[in-house]
Amino acid sequence: MDGFMRALVSVWTDSGFAALTIENIIMILVGLVLLYLAIAKEYEPLLLMPIAFGDIMANFPNTGFETDMGVMMAIGFGIKYEIFPPLIFMGVGAMTDFGPLIANPKTMLLGAAAQIGVFVALAGAMLLGFNVQEAASIGIIGGADGPTSIYLTSKLAPHLLGAVAVAAYSYMSLVPLIQPPIMKLCTTKEQRKIKMTNLRPVTHFEKVAFPIVVAIVVSLLLPPVASLMGMLCLGNLFEVSGVTGRLSDTAKNALCNIVTIFLATGTGLTMTGDKFIRVQTLEIICLGLVAFAAGTAGGVLFGQLMRIASGNKVNPLIGSAGVSAVPMAARVSQVVGLRDNPSNYLLMQAMGPNVAGVIGTAVAAGTMLAQFGG
């Protein structure tokens, strides 16, 4: 009988139940809430679901995920050594149509203006006591680009990766709720009714030349983001060249889906209780909202400048699409415009600043890496 009891005690002490802490329990509950949001509310389910499950698994004690070489540690290496974000960018490039930006290159300025949110949040984070590397990682949330946020944070402040990723993807899913009030605050009803002319046709040569030129210029200007921009442009070249259909299909479907699973699960695995349950996490979530709101406002206000300069030919609503939540932000511009003018179709015009925002966020990340990467 004593042997049986000792065996039971041994099983208990070796189990995860005995080592479970209050922090682990809280983070498992956080993971369950994220699963609920992903499944029941459909908030970025392709990303939040693996993040949530990774979070839950990370808070099981005595698993050896962080110490024993295995699939979980290998997934972590994919983030630590910057493998997954560039591969995601290849898929994004294959799914992105740069035609609206090529047809109206002035909208590149709107994509740049929307990055003001990144630097507003960076300044706010430094005022709250974060160091410059942590502040830069928090600020990039304002670009509304999950892979870029993960890429920059894994280089500058890997201990903040879980909080930054959850904030970035949460706000991306809430674009239709966050942006419209800010857009209406920065515009009048008459301005929202402005119709824009149709975009000119874009030639095949322009579509092929654009990713090549962007890859060369940005990579030479900002070498720290050469892998992101190179993969983005390569994926786009697969799509527009007309001769690599199989590669394009693989990049934007099978490969992108596989890497998304690994990237999101690996991000969730960083969300251990000792790293996540801090006052800093709430500050990051609040600063992320400030960054996103400031980026939206910055894009719309620059759209106002373009409206004035063009003699009321530019609808300032397209400026809000300068954040790189593709194509959600462009759809929001379209929806808000339709409410005040049911015959106003802004989607294609808004796609210009939207895809410019993808490039703009990568450039902002590269600038901060060059300045603060040390």
Segments from the language model and where they lie:
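Alpha-helical membrane segments and immediately flanking helix-loop junctions
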Residues: 81-82, 89-95, 110-120, 124, ...
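Interfacial helix-loop-helix linkers and transmembrane-helix boundary segments
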Residues: 40-48, 65-68, 72-75, 95-110, ...
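Membrane-embedded hairpin module used as a gating/binding unit in multi-pass transport
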Residues: 170-243
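Small-residue-rich segments of transmembrane alpha-helices in multi-pass membrane proteins
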Residues: 52-59, 112-123, 142-149, 213, ...
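Entry/N-cap segments of selected transmembrane alpha helices
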Residues: 32, 101-122, 273-299, 350-354
